[in-house]
Design a protein with these regions (language model features):
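Catalytic cores of phosphodiester-bond hydrolases, prominently lipid phosphodiesterases
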Residues: 1-166
């Protein structure tokens, strides 16, 4: 049986914890769980900074045990579909956020100079180019770049193997 588990609860921060394997070994992991934001930030930390911090943790490292889990998706309560009012105080337009942060992350890891693993990338609209629906709407045709982000992760994995000995 292969696998690992991570003990974490929803947080509005980037934090370090441990990733535990099925045979008892543990490795450090940095988690970007900045998901409930307003106007692009929470408690002074922007979503862009959270993505960058998580990627920087594994960037160019020689330590194969360094992992990150980058939760690229989020909900921006200032950009809610329902008349600008946040649903239950937490839910905003996730197609709006996917449009911004999927594209940003894809561009960052797909750049020629990027070397390193991207860790675990969690996203809304994986492999989808456009949203089909979102909260408060029956139809949304916003470009969400889920296809570009999946492609960037796959390309980076291939690029890393080819370029690590340059």
């Amino acid at each position: 049986y292969l696998g690992a588990y991570l003990n974490w609860t929803n947080d509005k921060v980037v934090f370090e914890t441990s990733l535990h394997g099925n045979t008892g070994e543990a490795a450090p992991i940095k988690v970007n769980d900045l998901y409930n934001i307003k106007n692009g930030a929470s408690d002074g930390k922007t979503k862009y900074a959270a993505i960058d911090e998580c990627i920087a943790y594994t960037y160019n490292t020689d330590d194969p045990t360094r992992w990150c889990m980058n939760y690229v998706s989020c909900y921006d309560t200032a950009h809610c579909s329902v008349s600008g009012i946040s649903l239950f105080g937490a839910v905003g337009d996730y197609d709006y956020c996917a449009n911004k942060y999927n594209r940003y992350t894809a561009d960052k890891i797909d750049s020629y100079d990027f070397r390193g693993n991207v860790g675990i990338v969690l996203m809304d609209f994986a492999a989808a180019s456009h949203a089909t629906m979102t909260y408060g709407q029956t139809y949304s045709n916003m470009q969400v770049y889920g296809d570009d982000l999946v492609r960037a992760v796959i390309c980076n994995n291939n690029k890393w193997n080819l370029r690590r000995n340059e």
